[in-house]
Design a protein with these regions (language model features):
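Short, surface-exposed beta-strand segments enriched in small/polar/acidic residues
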Residues: 47-63
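A generic local structural motif
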Residues: 1, 9, 41-44, 70
Length: 93
């Protein structure tokens, strides 16, 4: 299985869009939405190659809290222990 490239010392970024779609920001996955299971499998492979890597969840300001918590739980199952959050502002519409 190929290791997914993550630049040295840079966190792995997981984006959660307003509709709950999950994107893993690596070269091979950044342009397609992933299921929770796909995300967990990709992240597990990344952690095999880079244990201890920081993960940052970039969530849309309007994404449901429950969705963020579900993604965090799956990341922990995949081996992530250092998980941070970045929120994107809620649109002014």
């Amino acid at each position: 299985s190929e290791a997914l490239p993550v630049k040295n010392n840079e966190p792995l970024i997981i984006s959660i869009k307003k509709d709950g779609a999950i994107f893993l920001e690596t070269e091979s996955t950044k342009d397609r939405s992933l299921s929770l299971e796909e995300m967990k499998n990709f992240v597990s492979k990344i952690f095999e190659a880079s244990p201890g890597l920081q993960v940052v969840i970039r969530g849309d300001g309007e994404v449901k809290y429950e969705r963020v918590m579900t993604v965090m739980a799956e990341l922990q199952i995949a081996g992530a222990s250092d998980i941070g959050l970045i929120s994107q502002p809620i649109s002014s519409q």
